[in-house]
UniProtKB/Swiss-Prot annotation:
Keyword Coiled coil part of the UniProt annotation: no
InterPro entries in alphabetical order: DNA-dir_RNA_pol_insert (IPR011262), DNA-dir_RNA_pol_RpoA/D/Rpb3 (IPR011263), DNA-dir_RpoA (IPR011773), RBP11-like (IPR036603), RNAP_asu_C (IPR011260), RNApol_insert_sf (IPR036643)
GO terms for cellular component: cytoplasm; DNA-directed RNA polymerase complex
Entry's family note: Belongs to the RNA polymerase alpha chain family.
The EC number(s) this enzyme carries: 2.7.7.6
Keywords: DNA-directed RNA polymerase, Nucleotidyltransferase, Transcription, Transferase
Swiss-Prot/TrEMBL GO biological process terms: DNA-templated transcription
Protein's gene: rpoA
Subunit record text: Homodimer. The RNAP catalytic core consists of 2 alpha, 1 beta, 1 beta' and 1 omega subunit. When a sigma factor is associated with the core the holoenzyme is formed, which can initiate transcription.
Region (Alpha C-terminal domain (alpha-CTD)): 246-338
Domain of life: Bacteria
Organism this protein belongs to: Campylobacter curvus (strain 525.92)
The name this protein goes by in its record: DNA-directed RNA polymerase subunit alpha
Chain intervals for the UniProt region annotation (Alpha N-terminal domain (alpha-NTD)): 1-227
Amino acid sequence: MRKITTSAYMPTEIEVQSISENVAKITAYPFETGYAVTLAHPLRRLLYTSTVGFAPIGVKIKGVSHEFDSMRGMLEDVAFFIINLKKIRFKLKNDSEREVVEYSFKGPKEITGADLNNDVVEIVNPDAYLATINEDAELNFSVIIQKGIGYVPSEEIREEIEDDYIALDAFFTPVKKAVYELENVLVEDDPDYEKIVFTITTDGQVGPIEAFKHCLEAMYQQMSVFKGVLDIDVNAPMMSSSVGGEHAKLLSSVEELNLSARSFNCLDKAEIRYIGELALMDENELKDLKNLGKKSLEEIKAVMEEIGYPVGSDVLKDSKEQLRKKIAELKSQMSAKE
């Protein structure tokens, strides 16, 4: 039976699962009925529209005057060349927002994304096909790579580039797919709560977890206009569950710490899955982990201190037992799924 309350239930649990380099699953709960979809839908839209990516916005091909032209010695006409070019996902290696990259190829050659890698750009889908030129052909072209968000049609790009370039539709978003599911979750014998399960796939320009963080930042920034004028108290009291929201990061995977392969593999073999497990350990317990060397120990200590949970500190205080129970529960659920 639902109790009468004066504030909404505060969700405090989050699970971050890195399925692959470009796919992640993020779960948050418990939400009161109606709150989950209210948050999930705009977050999904923001993943597509606010995540920063890179795209070619203009191309200039030697000997070609317009997009409906053809080029001697190239299998594709210019229109198909442009279609293939837009499918190649560029990533600028520096902090610049725009770069002009020049390429020159002599035939015979099949050109793919891997051939476009250089000191300025990285191609995150190197197997993508671009064009084929015969033995008598030479292909020289320049591409303008731009940093941006969302989608911008070529008509608007036209005003941003030089007249001798062909303007391209720009698909900046690196998010290929973002879906969410709502599942029921039990809270104190009450089944009328929900969890949000996001599955995010990116193209490799940014990782899925980074993309999700960026969309959350975008939502906070957009909402801040109300806080400034209406004097909103973001720390207003709300109902919460066992592990406090301020410690929610401790329920994230140790993969989030971006440790070296040696350190991560050592933790993995010791079946340490969550950041909270490290926060509960002192230095001697860490030293006792099999095959954990001095460098790995120092790395873990440095990372834990950086996120606010120094090894051996008493930051958690009265939350330790609750955290142990929650981690045990999560591990049990993981084992059941396996």
